[in-house]
Amino acid sequence: MYALVTLAWWDFRTVRPRIGAMPIDFLQPAEIVAPQLLGCTLTHGGVGIRITEVEAYLDSTDEAAHTYRGKTPRNAAMFGPGGHMYVYISYGIHRAGNIVCGPEGTGQGVLLRAGEVVSGESIAQNRRGERIPHARLAQGPGNFGQALGLEVSDNHASVFGPSFLISDGVETPEIVRGPRIGISKNTEALLRFWIPNDPTVSGRRGYPKE
């Protein structure tokens, strides 16, 4: 069920090696963009988080996507151009962040599931709680959003500034992909990507058995 992808930074569509840091093309499909985000740092609100776990959500063909039933006021940001934020309220309290992908109108995005706070840790601690261990500060979509200081008003904001800033893609030697978690539809799609053995990854049960 799981696939271990060993990379010298691969472009999944063209299967060609990428060497060094390179800008990410957010107009590509979410499934292509998602693994490229691993290792990148997203900065906002005085905090920088190195992304370690993501999930791709596709267009209206993906029953688990917020865009499955079409465009609404709540998910309108997902139908914007790639490279912009889509923030929604989860379980009535958490702010979960997604980066929109694909051409405008396609309704694709990548959910930011987990990461490591690499700058502004004192700010993230104040937002999350003074006694939260470092590895858990941005572990899980809601915690990621809280540590980063996400609000619904951040919808449509570009990840290229001024409020957000995403670093270029980086070399990631190994990436694991498997089913998304916390959903009830399209559960077998291998659209969750994470850095193996990273302590910040949220879906511990998603690791392959050794």
Swiss-Prot record:
Keywords: DNA damage, DNA repair, Hydrolase. GO terms for biological process: base-excision repair. InterPro entries: Formyl_transferase-like_C_sf, MPG, MPG_sf. Its EC number is 3.2.2.-. The keyword Metal-binding does not apply. It comes from the Bacteria. Pfam families: Pur_DNA_glyco. The keyword Nucleus does not apply. One of its GO terms (molecular function) is DNA binding. HAMAP family: 3MGH. Belongs to the DNA glycosylase MPG family. This is Putative 3-methyladenine DNA glycosylase.
